[in-house]
Amino acid sequence: MNILKISKQTLRNNIKIIREYIGNAKMCFPVKANAYGHGIEDIVENTHDLVDFFAVANSLEAFRVTAVAKNPVLVFGVIYYEYIEKMISENIRVSIQDYEYIEKLEQIAKELDKKVYAHININTGMNRMGVDYNDACRTIQRAYESDWLILEGVYSHLACADNRDHPTNIKQKNRFDSIVKFTKGLSQDIICHLSNSYGFLGQKGICYDMVRPGILSYGFLPEFYVDRVIREIKPIARLLSKVVKIITLQEGEGVGYSLIYRGFEGEQLAVIPIGYGDGFPRELGDRGFVNINDVMYPMAGRMSMDGLTVSLGINEYDVKVGDTVELISAIPRNRNSAFSIAKQTNTIEYDIMSTLNNRIIRKII
């Protein structure tokens, strides 16, 4: 059995640290992609009293949140019309991505005789989604004056927040500042928000009315940030499995597909029942590390869909079937932390955690 064990205490402590850091700004907690792989229902259930909003990528994720919490939920992505009636009935916040979408929302709201809560996404430079910057004020004005929309928020997203010195950050901030000025001229109550984790850590004066700290809440810090308070944030999860078999190699034998790993006579290998079919990175095969009984062991041979093997050498520490295996550590400096795994596989921690799928059990401890 493969289990992602999540520390409730660490999770809640991370959020409390963030809330202290951001002062009076509201906190919108992103739980998209199954709460970055940690399990959306468990994460929401254990944090809803600490945050103001939750944010997700689509309608189906939003329904999973509203099933366990009453907090406002903002959907970042495009809305699918087959779900829009349920979204409106549950007061799920819709993102307006272009001017024309306002009229479509109004028509549906009239049919339901219920107003729609909306946030307008402005493209200030990421060039992915959102109302064009040059059309922002017209769109905001139109939504604000609508009889069927409640314009609750206006937001944008930084393209280069992970590089705090990138000139695009200032360009986007300046554009957003002008939008904020226009928006606040209509109503001081409209929530303006721009920053994700890297954004409000790397840029000054960028919290506005609300921040959206996703990866930071789960315990992953940008390398550039050394603030003492924020450094108290810790990863919340460990991925664990069990040794299911010990194999002893004979002379000239190898292990796994294509037998790319060739061991020595008498070498012992531990078989672990987790593979890329569980969302664990296949690239780690033959170069990753796992922790068994506080000893690091290297992976040996190619990872398969349902399993991997690690070399125990001569097994001087007497690893046995049933021993616990730590595949992802909650200690960032360890060779099997999500940070280290991301470095080894040329990706980011978001990727490592969010691709862990439902073959892995999530357990809050």
From Swiss-Prot:
Keywords noted in UniProt: Isomerase, Pyridoxal phosphate
UniProt keyword annotation of Isomerase present: yes
CDD domains per record: PLPDE_III_AR
Active site: K32 (proton acceptor), Y257 (proton acceptor)
One Gene Ontology CC term in the entry: cytosol
Sites of N6-(pyridoxal phosphate)lysine modification: K32
Pfam families linked to this entry: Ala_racemase_C, Ala_racemase_N
Enzyme class: isomerase
GO biological process: one example: D-alanine biosynthetic process
Residues given in the record as substrate binding sites: R128, M305
Reactions catalysed, as given in the entry: L-alanine = D-alanine
Cofactor(s) the protein needs: pyridoxal 5'-phosphate
Job of this protein: Catalyzes the interconversion of L-alanine and D-alanine. May also act on other amino acids.
Name by which UniProt lists this protein: Alanine racemase
Species, as recorded: Francisella tularensis subsp. holarctica (strain FTNF002-00 / FTA)
